[in-house]
C-alpha cells in the first residue's frame, strides 16, 4: 500500500484579494515523483512553494485549508519553519550557487544546523555530491568557486546542497528550463535515482519531461487542479476535455 507523504485538503491561497488556488485536494505519495503541469500563471509554482511555506515571504499571502507532512499540518502555528524547510528542500528554476567554493556551498546548510566537525562535514559534502552524481566532476575542485561551473554542474551542485541537510522531500521548480538537452537528461536521470530515497515534486513546462520521469501528474488551469492521477493514464486517456486540449497543444 502506498504511503502518503503530503496531503493537501481544501487548499485555497490568496495574494491579497487575488484568489490564486481554488479548493486543491491532493495526495502526494512517498518515494514517487509527482509532476505539476499547466500554462503559465495556472498556480503550479504557487502550490509548490506552499509545500515548504516559501509563500510566507510574499506580502499579503494567506491560505485556508491544510497541507500535512506525515500527518502534521505545516501551517500549524507551533511548527518551526526552519525545520520544515530542512525536511522539504527546494531547487529553483535557475541554478543559484552561492558565491563561495563548491565545498562551502554544500556545507552551508549543515553548518547552519550546528555541524562544525570537519570530518563530519567532509563526509556530508562527499555523500551529497555523490548523490547528486557530480562527485567525480568536482572532487578535485572543492575549493574552487562554484560560479565557474557550467549551468548543468551548478544545478546538480544546488541539488547536492539541498540534499546535504537530509530532506525527506525535494521540490523542483522547473529545474531544467535553463539547461541544454544533455544537462536536462542528467537531471532527469538523477531525479529517477533520487526517488528511491526521497519524495520529489517537480513543476515543469515540458510535458514530455513529466511523461519521462513522473509517477503522478497534476494538470492546473487558472488556479484549479483540473485532473490528477497516474501519469501514463493522464496523458493517454485524460478524463477532462481541458486536459486533453492542453496535452495535445490546442492551448497553453
Curated annotation (Swiss-Prot):
InterPro entries associated with the record: AAA+_ATPase, ABC_transporter-like_ATP-bd, ABC_transporter-like_CS, P-loop_NTPase, PstB-like
Subcellular location: Cell membrane
Keywords: ATP-binding, Cell membrane, Membrane, Nucleotide-binding, Phosphate transport, Translocase, Transport
Keyword Phosphoprotein: no
UniProt topology in membrane: Peripheral membrane protein
Name of one Pfam family that matches: ABC_tran
SMART domains: AAA
GO molecular function terms listed in the Swiss-Prot or TrEMBL record: ATP binding; ATP hydrolysis activity; ATPase-coupled phosphate ion transmembrane transporter activity
Domain ABC transporter residue range list: 6-247
Record-level GO BP terms: phosphate ion transmembrane transport
Record flagged with keyword Nucleotide-binding: yes
GO cellular component: plasma membrane
Subunit relationships: The complex is composed of two ATP-binding proteins (PstB), two transmembrane proteins (PstC and PstA) and a solute-binding protein (PstS).
Family per record: Belongs to the ABC transporter superfamily. Phosphate importer (TC 3.A.1.7) family.
Protein name according to UniProt: Phosphate import ATP-binding protein PstB
